Structures are given as C-alpha cells and as structure tokens.
Amino acid sequence: MGIEPNILENKKRHIDICLNKNDVKSGCNFLRFVKLKHNALSDFNFSEIDIKEEIFGYNISMPVFISSMTGGGKEGNDFNKSLVKIANYLKIPIGLGSFKLLFKYPEYIRDFALKRYAHSIPLFANIGAVQIVEFGISRIVEMIKRLEVDAIIVHLNAGQELMNVNGDRNFKGIKESIAKLSNFISVPLIVKETGFGISPSDVKKLFQLGVSYIDLAGSGGTNWVLVEGMKGNNLNIASCFSDWGIPSIFTLLSINDSLKANIFASGGYETGMDIAKGIALGAKLIGVAAVVLRAFYDSGEDAVFSLFSDYEHVLKMSMFLSGSKSLSDFRNNKYFLSSYLLAEFGVFKQFYGT
C-alpha cells in the first residue's frame, strides 16, 4: 500500500516553503548582540585547537548536529539518506524526521532505519510528544528498538499543530507520557521544541521528568506556524505569531553551567559565528537544519560539505582569537553582551522569574 498522496504532498510543501527562508523566519535570535572576547596574545599553535566532542559514547568532530527535518516519500527519504551519509563522513550526529508515518505504513521502516549508513555517529529517531499518548509507550518503545537508533527525540510542536487544519488539538497527558517513556527506553531521551523555545522553568521540569538532554530550538529560525500558514493559505492568523517564542540565548543565559552540559541550542544558527557564540554561551551542541536543507537543494552534497568546513574554520578561528585551545576553555567565559541585549534579557528575567 502506498502512502496517501496528500501526506506526501504536505511533506513536499513543507520543504518547498522552507527553502525560502525570508518567508518563514521568525523574530530575532539575538546572537548578533553577543560579542566574543578578543585576546591579542594567544600564545599557542592554531593546530593545537581541539573542537572534538563526546556524546552518547561517540567521538564527534565538532559540537554541531543536523536537526530533524523530514521523512517519508521518495524525495524525503533520498534527502535523509544523503544527509546521514554526509553526517557519517563528517562525524557529526544527525536526527531523522518523525516516524509517526510508520504506525500506519510499517512496510516503510527501512526508509527510517538508517543506522546502516551511520556506523560512526549518533543517529536520532524522532516522534511528537502527542504521538506517545496516541500510540502508547509500548509501541513507541518497540519502534525505537526496530530503528536501532542511539537516542530518541520527542518534539513539542503545539504551535504547528494548532495552525494545521488537520493537526492535533489534544495535548493532555504529554508530561506523564514523557516521564513514562524515559523509564522504558534503553537510549537517551532528548526533548526539543520546534522553533518557539523552552523557558528556564520548563527546562527544569523536563529534567525532573527524566529527560536526558534538551534541545531549546528557540525562536529566530524557521517558524512552523508561518510554514503551516503558508501551506494552508492562512497567513492572516499565522502572521500574528511571527515573533512568538523564546530565543535559545535567553534560556542559555538563565540556567546554570551544570544544566548546560545537557543542553543543545538551535533556532536560527546558520553561520560559523552563530555556532561559535552558542558554544561560548555554554551549549553542549548546536543544531542546524534549514541552512543545510537550502545548501543541499541549491547545490547538492558539495555545498553541505563546504558549509561544515566553514563551520569548523570559523569556530577554530573564534577560539584562537579568544585564547581558547579547547571547548571547555571556550565555554561560558569568552563573551560579553551588548547593552541592548542586557536590557532585553533583564525584561526576560523579570517576566519569566529567573
């Protein structure tokens, strides 16, 4: 049985819309108001700089991962397969699109079970929090086992669902389901937002539920309410939420260093300098998605390799110019904030009680 044409068309429309970043980019991620400290007396060899990181038992080449994007249908599956192979070559983690589709079309599991192409890196499966409630813990756990992944991402995407005419409306029970899932799986559990961010208090709640890692996925990147609004020709409502959400930088600045060790940051991180600033602010890993999608669709695999080569060089240059040989030296003490950002962050702290 083939996948319903409307499902495939929806996925294709998502890709087409996301390829035009100016139409679906949300708010501001405030990274341009972070400045990295300059050290004119860096007294070591540039070749000594080490940006390798360890995560889930793997040594990865840099503190960057490719975030989950799409899956299902020939175009999405070919895209995922290509990216997994690229990620394996680069030695960086990668997340796959939601496997929700497999509960209706289990015969397509091979399109999602891509560990055979990811021997050297962590591979993440992905499912919505609502689907844990919908399909039950046991079925989710069994699917995770069949996919042979290294971790599971549970995404929170209420805004997108509420903007989708056929999206989910009942989110009752997601906290209990996340807590239960953490007790029944043998791989790390990552919870992520999908472009609206996670507040400091919600970060603490998620860790109390048993979550291993959190991807803040803040505002400033792809806004999925706008994506759904464009797909459904309903921008009158969607545009009201064009600047909704929490930039990941505000949450990073609000939580202590011990929590940051289990925090990923994403949401509008596109350049090597964006990545350098996110790491300097203390994130364990930085997630990139739409910028990779556009590079791949514009110019193919070579463009993706070039993108990550740039990331590596800019991160290393930033570390050298701030006097840092290692990521541990670079994190949390090599930046300062502009007066504008300090003022905005002050309002944030007052509003969110941090």
From Swiss-Prot:
Mg(2+) binds at E161. GO terms for cellular component: cytoplasm. It catalyses: isopentenyl diphosphate = dimethylallyl diphosphate. It comes from the Bacteria. Substrate binds at K11, K12, S98, F99, K100, Q160. One of its GO terms (molecular function) is FMN binding. Its cofactor is FMN; NADPH; Mg(2+). It is found in: Cytoplasm. Homooctamer. Dimer of tetramers. This is Isopentenyl-diphosphate delta-isomerase.
